[in-house]
A protein has these predicted regions:
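Short recognition patches in nucleic-acid-associated and regulatory proteins
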Residues: 3-46
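Terminal catalytic/cofactor-binding subdomain
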Residues: 24, 43, 49-155, 243
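Aromatic/basic-lined ligand-recognition segments
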Residues: 90, 177-243
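A common structural junction motif
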Residues: 112-119, 149-157, 188-191, 257-266
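Helical (often loop-to-helix) elements that flank the catalytic cores of nucleotide-handling enzymes
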Residues: 138-148, 172-199, 245-259
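Flexible helix-coil linker/hinge segments at domain or subdomain boundaries
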Residues: 157, 192-206, 261-293
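Histidine-centered divalent-metal-coordination microenvironment in nucleic-acid enzymes
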Residues: 157-173, 234-238
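Modules that initiate DNA replication and primer synthesis
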Residues: 231-281, 285
Length: 295
């Protein structure tokens, strides 16, 4: 499949995704139909082709949490210079509006309109999904979730069909794929040992078909793994769902610290195979210690 650059114009005969409508205009409640040649085709890795109008193309910049976060990172939130605070993070929050009240729909629309870092797009499994641009810091998303909880409107994000997956930039993805089981099986087993009730309390949901626990035979790049390595520049945690402001913020901080640890871990890549595997296992054990700080 052809990968489009963000500056490539839609040409005559090119297939217009979403019937030629700017997806960012739609996020603000405006249906903006674009004729052939008027919009810009944007390629969002793992999401596919998307069209934006000229105004949003000029003002928007880099779109998508799957892209290399070093390009066009939106420095939202904290001004701290710690490694942890400056680790780019993105989320994709699924929504369920099939039985939503007018106030819930209005709240979601206001949420999207108030954001310069997320937009609404379609998802075949739910009624909508809000991916964010890479963020440094958690203040903005924290305030949004706190506001929704205060007004008893978190139900639009916590339906049992929804997820709230977390992506954190990782500079060791190829290595993580190679030693996936050594790194993540200890953490997987610890989460499994919590029991269903505690998992739902901590993560907002239990294992399910699109967030499955792993075993020694799991494919490291299987999309449904709770720890997903299929993206080139991020590690994704697929288990969470938003059920509360503090609950989800705790999950974000946990996964950010896990990936930050992996990014700066000395995997001894020049050592022999036995040493490399033992080093990867030691990393996996350290991730469990991180998890125990949070839950």
């Amino acid at each position: 499949m052809k990968a489009y650059n963000i500056n490539e114009k839609v040409t005559e005969g090119e297939h217009n995704v979403r019937r030629g409508r700017c997806i960012l205009c739609e996020a603000h409640g405006v249906t903006n139909y674009l004729d052939k040649g008027e919009g810009y085709m944007v390629w969002i890795p793992s999401r596919g082709k998307r069209i934006v109008c000229n105004e949003h193309y000029i003002n928007r910049g880099s779109i998508g949490y799957h892209s290399n976060a070093l390009r066009g990172v939106s420095k939202i939130g904290t001004h701290k210079t710690t490694t942890l605070a400056n680790t780019p993070l993105g989320i994709e929050v699924e929504t369920s509006l099939y039985n939503a009240s007018d106030s819930e729909y209005t709240a979601l629309r206001a949420l999207v309109e108030s954001c310069t870092f997320c937009y609404m797009e379609s998802d075949c499994t739910v009624s909508g999904e809000m991916p964010t641009q890479p963020m440094e810091g958690l203040n903005r998303i924290s305030k949004i979730l706190q506001s929704l909880e205060m007004h008893n409107q978190l139900s639009i994000l916590s339906h049992n069909s929804c997820g709230a997956h977390v992506h954190v930039e990782c500079n060791r993805v190829p290595y993580v794929r190679r030693y996936y089981h050594s790194i993540f099986l200890p953490l997987n087993d610890y989460i499994d040992s919590l029991g269903a009730e505690r998992r739902i309390e901590v993560f907002g949901s239990d294992f399910r078909y699109y967030a499955m626990k792993i075993n020694e035979n799991s494919d490291p790049q299987a999309h449904s793994n709770i720890f997903n390595t299929q993206h080139a520049h991020t590690l994704e945690f697929r288990l969470p769902r938003v059920t509360g402001y503090k609950q989800y913020m705790n999950v974000l901080k946990f996964w950010r610290e896990v990936v930050c640890y992996i990014n700066h871990y000395n995997f001894k890549e020049d050592a022999d195979a036995v040493t490399r595997k033992a080093t990867a296992r030691a990393c996996g054990e350290a991730l469990v210690k991180i998890a125990k700080k949070y839950f």
